[in-house]
Amino acid sequence: MTAQRRAEVIEDLRIHAAALLYFDAVRRAGSIREAARRLNVASSAVNRQILKLEAEIGAPLFDRFPDGIRLTSAGEAIARHVLVVLQDLDRARSDIEGLKGARIGHIAIAAVEGVCGALLAAVIRRLRERTPRVTVAAEPMGSLAIPKAVLDGDVDLGIAFALPRHAELRQVAVGRFRLGAIMAPDHPLASRAKVSLSMCFDYPVIMPMGELSIGQLLAPALARLSRNVRPIIRSSSIELMRELAERGIGIAFQTRVGLDKHIAEKRLVHVPLDAGGPIWSDLGVYVRAGRALPATLDLALHILAEELREREIAEASVPA
């Protein structure tokens, strides 16, 4: 790149910095008015920057509708570029702070509901012991919503069970955990070493709704049952199914992740499922593919990987 071209690029960045930030805010908010409210500026100022950017690019970036706005194809291309620029800037800031001997930063995490308890709490505790100035935002989210949140830059990392492969997502860590039936300690099946789905359906059963990965893992075994079965309750809430099982209302299905305290306090029993063999559920940690990771985020991912390995080892030591 020539000196003249470098000067032109720097000037373009200076001119478009505000427009790109406003564009990203509008994309996230879904409307110019809401973006202006979040930025604490006038709607007209935001609209002016968007129009300027559209004029420079020579194409509309948003389709305007009565209920809000949506990205056009050109807008989606710009959104990918803006996301890379902002995340690279975040990494540069983190690296500079690292050179000063101070790790700071903010990490946004989306995790499936059952993981936002013991597992994530343990990871955040270990992270803050090593980087006291880091801040964390942790949001429970369904497995199907997590890839989009990571790819859109709404969160830095996602933690989910059984995600299908995605070219734009990179799996940076994974733990393999056995699916089991959870029930009250006084349940007739609680003392067994393992149970089949057919045995579980001799009693009231609580089943996950379709959007939960547990349901997808159970589907092949359910299809092989030689009788029609009907759960007494269906729910998309991991916490609700856990609570119902603890109260003796029925049998639910989960991995041991997040059940540590319940099992230790003898409020729940986890009995491994046998469907001609174990049913395994992979808990993966994901970031956007190709992203250069800030030092603080990289550290958080290493801690998550360590925590998952430790839990795999602990589960393997439980008698089958």
Regions inferred by a protein language model and the residue ranges of each:
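A short LG(V/I)-centered, amphipathic sequence patch enriched
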Residues: E54-E76
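Hydrophobic hinge/microswitch elements
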Residues: A111, G142-V155, A160-F161, E211-V271
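Beta-alpha-beta core module
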Residues: H166-A173, F177, M199, E239-A289
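Interdomain hinge and pocket-entrance segments immediately C-terminal to HTH DNA-binding domains
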Residues: H16-A17, D67, E97-C116, E129-V134, ...
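Secondary-structure junction motif
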Residues: P204-L225, L293-I303, E307-P319
